[in-house]
C-alpha cells in the first residue's frame, strides 16, 4: 500500500508540472534562459576595452593593465600610478595606452615599460599605429606621433582644444581623421603630420569619427551629423539630429544610429542623413555597437541592454537584458559575444540565447 501511495503522489506531481508549464506563460523555456553573466569581477572601475591578440585587455583606476586571453588565466600588470579610461592598443605584444595624468606608455608584459612620455594633460582616447608611428590625442590640445621603438616625437598637431577621440586611419591616402572639442574635424597627413583640411561642426566633437565604405561620419555634441568623403574630404551632407550627443555614430547596413544623453535614439539613412525612426528610451544610452547589418546594441547608464533589429524594412526595439548595475561605457563585440564593463570594475558578457 505504501509503495502504491508513493507512486500515486509521484504521478500527481508530474501532472502538476505539466499543467504549470502549459498554463504559465512565464514558465522558463529555452529561449528565456539567462543570456548574460558576470565574467570578471574587479575592485576598480575599468576603462574602455581593447583587442589583445586572441583576447582583449583593459586598464583600471589603479593603474593596472588586465589581459584576458582565451583559455588562459587573467593576467594583471602594474603600468602606472594613475587611473585609466582610454582603451589599450596592442601591437606585436606591446601595449600603448595613455593615463589620466597625461602619460603615454609603451609597455611589454615580458620586459616592462619600454618608454613613456608625459603630455600636458590627461589622455582619454585610444591610439592608432601606422608604419612605425603611434598616434594619440591629449587634453593638452595636441595630437602626437611617437616612434614605436624609441618614443621619440616625430610630429605634433595643434587641435585647438582638448582631444577626447581616437584618430581614424584612411590608409589609401595615408591620412587620418580626428575630431576635437573645438568642433573641427581634421584631415592630417600620416607622412609628415601636415594639416590637410578641417570642417567646422560648430560644437565640440566628443567621440571618434567612424569610417565606413570610404565615408567618414562625425557627430558633434549639439547633434550635427556630417558625412565626408575620405578620399578628398568633400562634405556629402550635414544634418541636425539630437542635442547632447556623447557617443559616436554607429553604422548598421544602410543606416546611421545616433543616441543622445536625454535617452533618445534615432535611425537615419546612411546615404543622406534623412530621419527614419526615433525612440524615446527615458535613460542615457552609451556608445552603440553594430552586429552585422541588421542588429544594433547599446547599454544604458542604468545597465539595461537595448537591441534594435532590422526586418521587413523596419527597425524594432526591445530590452534584452537588465544587468542591474550602472554602466558608463559602451558595448564591445568580441567574437559572437558582447562585453560590457560596469561601474564597479566588472565585465558582463551577453550572448544571444538562440542565435
What are these regions (language model features)?
Residues 4-15, 19-355:
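Extracytoplasmic/lumenal domain signature
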Amino acid at each position: 500500500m505504501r509503495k502504491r501511495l508513493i507512486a500515486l503522489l509521484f504521478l500527481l506531481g508530474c501532472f502538476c508540472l505539466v499543467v504549470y508549464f502549459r498554463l504559465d506563460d512565464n514558465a522558463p523555456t529555452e529561449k528565456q534562459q539567462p543570456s548574460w553573466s558576470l565574467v570578471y569581477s574587479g575592485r576598480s572601475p575599468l576603462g574602455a576595452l581593447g583587442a589583445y591578440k586572441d583576447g582583449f585587455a583593459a586598464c583600471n583606476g589603479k593603474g593596472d593593465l588586465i589581459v584576458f586571453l582565451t583559455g588562459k588565466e587573467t593576467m594583471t600588470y602594474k603600468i602606472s600610478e594613475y587611473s585609466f579610461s582610454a582603451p589599450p592598443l596592442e601591437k606585436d605584444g606591446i601595449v600603448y595606452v595613455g593615463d589620466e595624468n597625461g602619460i603615454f606608455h609603451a609597455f611589454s608584459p615580458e620586459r616592462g615599460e619600454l618608454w613613456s612620455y608625459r603630455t600636458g594633460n590627461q589622455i582619454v582616447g585610444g591610439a592608432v599605429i601606422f608604419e612605425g608611428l603611434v598616434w594619440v590625442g591629449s587634453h593638452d590640445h595636441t595630437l602626437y606621433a611617437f616612434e614605436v621603438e624609441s618614443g621619440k616625437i616625430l610630429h605634433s598637431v595643434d587641435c585647438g582644444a582638448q582631444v577626447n577621440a581616437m584618430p581614424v586611419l584612411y590608409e589609401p591616402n595615408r591620412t587620418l581623421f580626428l575630431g576635437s572639442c573645438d568642433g573641427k574635424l581634421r584631415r592630417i597627413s600620416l607622412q609628415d603630420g601636415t594639416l590637410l583640411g578641417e570642417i567646422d561642426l560648430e560644437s565640440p566633437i566628443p567621440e571618434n569619427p567612424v569610417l565606413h565604405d570610404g565615408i567618414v561620419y562625425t557627430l558633434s555634441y549639439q547633434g550635427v551629423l556630417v558625412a565626408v568623403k575620405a578620399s578628398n574630404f568633400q562634405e556629402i551632407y550635414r544634418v541636425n539630429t539630437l542635442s547632447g550627443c556623447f557617443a559616436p555614430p554607429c553604422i548598421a547596413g544602410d543606416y546611421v544610429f545616433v543616441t543622445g544623453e536625454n535617452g533618445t535614439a534615432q535611425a537615419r539613412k546612411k546615404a543622406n542623413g534623412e530621419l527614419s525612426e526615433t525612440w524615446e528610451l527615458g535613460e542615457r544610452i552609451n556608445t552603440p555597437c553594430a552586429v552585422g547589418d541588421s542588429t544594433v546594441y547599446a547599454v544604458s547608464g542604468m545597465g539595461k541592454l537595448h537591441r534594435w533589429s532590422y526586418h521587413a524594412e523596419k527597425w524594432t526595439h526591445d530590452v534584452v537584458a537588465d544587468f542591474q548595475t550602472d554602466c558608463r561605457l559602451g558595448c564591445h563585440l568580441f567574437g559572437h559575444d558582447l562585453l560590457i564593463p560596469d561601474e564597479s570594475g566588472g565585465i558582463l558578457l551577453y550572448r544571444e540565447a538562440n542565435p
